[in-house]
Amino acid sequence: MIQLSKRIYTLLGVSLASLGIVFLLLAATLLTMVPLSSGFTERSAKAAIIGVLAFSLGIGLTLRQTKKDRHPTRTSLIFGILLPGIVGWLIFAAIIYALQDDLLFSPRTLSLDRATTVSQQFPQAQEVYIKSDAATLHGWFLPASNSKPAPLIILFYGQGGEASRYLRMAEKIPEASWAFINYRGYGWSTGTPSQDAIFSDGVTIYDHFAQHPLVDEGRIIALAGSLGTGPAVYLAANRPLAAVLLFSPYDSIAGGVAQDLIPFVPTKVLLRNSFNVMEYAQAAQSPLLAVIGDADQVIKPVRSYTLVENWAHTALQRVVPGGTHYSIYEDDETWEAIRDFLLKLAITTTN
């Protein structure tokens, strides 16, 4: 009975210490994700407090029971300390694996009120439904002011975006028509997002608009940011885009961006959706302009530089001094550089 009681206390101690390790790893991970949201700072602090308390209590119980043994060995002491670390790490890795899709994709819904607001603010916007395999993609086509075939800019946004939030961006290049289409599972698009689905959908969107009477098929551009640069790079390798404009591009998510944000587990092995776009960059058929913030802590500049260096076609980069993952979109000089880039390629005729 006494022996059973000792085992229960030891098991309880190891379990608490393991839980503490999980929370400490979570706290450290949330801290690396603060550039995504300042709210992670408070969550990280709370997780750290829980982790320290649980680990301290667990180790205390484990060592107390070990010392009560008549013949405690160094091995049992080391085992009592190392086991929680191993178990805690395995649990944390399992959590990351189980929640990987929730971490990678953050679909925003589209309310009826929001859709009504879009129609009021942009009366010229045409709602679009595009069939892509078993899914139906929803979004808007915003034609240029003239009635002739015009350049088209297809937007690919980041992981927490939603197409209706970006229509105002069309004011930056009014000479072009714009396509704002939601990924699967985002807005009113059906289906579930994944790497293969989003990549395939990008090609479907291109093919749909290439036949549109108000689109000049020879002047279709992909403009993408963050997560969305992946499908844009894939599209550049599979369709003859006139140009590619990328904000904060990456070489790989599983082996790069995710590893930077979650350095405690091998994300390259754990993540099903790798978003490794290097092979597509090396097969790109279009000129590139990459916009990179040198203070970007979400997608580190080295990730962007690697992609640019491996781009098969002409590649230019604009580095925004002090630019963060979000502020680079508000830089007026960047949009000036983009308009100049398109003008030199004869895609547009005005700057």
Task: For every predicted segment, state its role.
Residues F23-F40, S44-A45, G85-Y129:
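An N-terminal hydrophobic leader/cap segment in hydrolases
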Residues L12-R64:
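Membrane-embedded alpha-helical segments of integral membrane proteins
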Residues G323-E333:
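Catalytic histidine-centered segment of alpha/beta-hydrolase-like enzymes
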Residues H208-H212, G218-I262:
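Primarily recognizes the serine-hydrolase "nucleophile elbow" in alpha/beta-hydrolase
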Residues A295-I299, H325-Y326:
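Acidic catalytic loop of the alpha/beta-hydrolase fold
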Residues M169, V277, S286, K300-E309:
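Short alpha-helix in the alpha/beta-hydrolase fold that links the catalytic acid
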Residues A284, A290-D296:
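Short beta-strand/loop motif that positions the catalytic acidic residue
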Residues A134-H208:
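Membrane-embedded segments
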